[in-house]
Amino acid sequence: MFMGEFLHSIDTKGRIIVPSKFRDNLGSSFVVTRGLDKCLFAYPMDEWKILEEKLKQLPLTKKDARAFTRFFFSGAIECEVDKQGRINIPANLRNYAGLEKDCNVIGVSNRVEFWANDAWEDYVTESEDSFAEIAENLMDFDI
C-alpha cells in the first residue's frame, strides 16, 4: 500500500528520485502512464496486470472505452529504478503532467502519483475546501 507525500526535484535529464518507502512496493520495474487530473500514475507490475485485464473487458464498440484505453496504454512505459533510486520520465509524460522542476510524489493506495508541485498545491487547496462535501458524496460507498 502506498501513502504519504514527498517533494523531489527533476534533474535536467528528466530523472526523479522515487522515495525509498515506495521503491520496495513498486519493485525494480513498474509502469508509469498518464493519469487523471494531469498527473502521472505509477503501478507495480502486479497491479498493472490487474488493471490491464479489467480494461480488456471494456467493450470495443463503446467510443469512451476505446478513447480511455488508447489514452491510458499509449502513454504507458515500463520504468526501471537506477542505483541512485531514480527513474527517467520521458519528455512526453513530463509535458503531459507539467513536470519541470519540483515534483510531488504521492502514495494513493495501490498506485503512486507524480504531480507538478504547483498543480498539486492547487489541487490540495481546492480539495480542502470541498472535503466535507466529497466525503458526503461517498457515503453511498460505505466509507
Curated annotation (Swiss-Prot):
Q: List the disulfide bonds.
A: none
Record keywords, A-Z: Cytoplasm, DNA-binding, Repeat, Transcription, Transcription regulation
Q: In terms of one coarse class, where is the protein primarily found?
A: cytoplasm
Q: Which GO MF terms does the UniProt record name? A: DNA-binding transcription factor activity; transcription cis-regulatory region binding
Q: Where in the cell is it found?
A: Cytoplasm, Nucleoid
One Gene Ontology cellular component annotation held by this UniProt entry = cytoplasm
Task: Return the InterPro entries for the record.
Answer: MraZ, MraZ_C, MraZ_dom, MraZ_N, MraZ_sf, SpoVT-AbrB_dom, SpoVT-AbrB_sf
Can you supply a Gene Ontology BP term from the record?
Answer: negative regulation of DNA-templated transcription initiation
Q: Which residues form the SpoVT-AbrB domain?
A: 5-47, 76-119
Similarity annotation:
Belongs to the MraZ family.
Q: Summarize the subunit comment.
A: Forms oligomers.
| HAMAP family given in the database record | MraZ
Listed name of the protein: Transcriptional regulator MraZ
Naturally occurring in which organism (per UniProt)? Oceanobacillus iheyensis (strain DSM 14371 / CIP 107618 / JCM 11309 / KCTC 3954 / HTE831)
What is this organism's lineage? Bacteria, Bacillati, Bacillota, Bacilli, Bacillales
